[in-house]
Design a protein with these regions (language model features):
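C-terminal structural segments of small proteins and small subunits
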Residues: 44-77
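Short, solvent-exposed polar/charged micro-motifs at secondary-structure junctions
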Residues: 29-33, 75-77
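Short active-site-proximal "capping" loops at secondary-structure junctions
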Residues: 26-28, 38, 72
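Solvent-exposed beta-strand sheet faces enriched in polar/charged residues
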Residues: 22, 32-34, 68-70
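A generic structural signal for short beta-strands and their flanking turns/coil linkers
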Residues: 17, 25-29, 61-65
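N-terminal first-folded block
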Residues: 1-26
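A short interface-forming secondary-structure element
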Residues: 32-45
Length: 77
């Protein structure tokens, strides 16, 4: 698994999302995801939305994913 594959999965699974994913070892990644669908949702709900885009890859091909989830307005602040 690589960072670009994860970015594509997130952006495909969350229409309108922009994702920046980093990770050099192939199993530990950091991602910043900006999506207006996060508006009004608590951080845990936002993270679950992102995890849902990754299917069964979490805990397998992706060992760890540190998330920062923002709306467009939060990202602009």
């Amino acid at each position: 698994m690589n960072a670009d594959s994860i970015r594509q999965m997130i952006e495909t699974g969350l229409p309108g999302a922009r994702a920046e994913v980093r990770g050099d070892d192939g199993v530990h990644f950091e991602a910043t995801v900006v999506c207006d669908a996060f508006a009004g949702k608590l951080p845990l709900a936002r993270h679950r939305m992102v995890y849902a885009t990754l299917g069964g890859k979490m805990g397998g091909e992706i060992n760890a994913l540190q998330l920062r989830t923002l709306t467009e307005q939060e990202a602009a602040a």
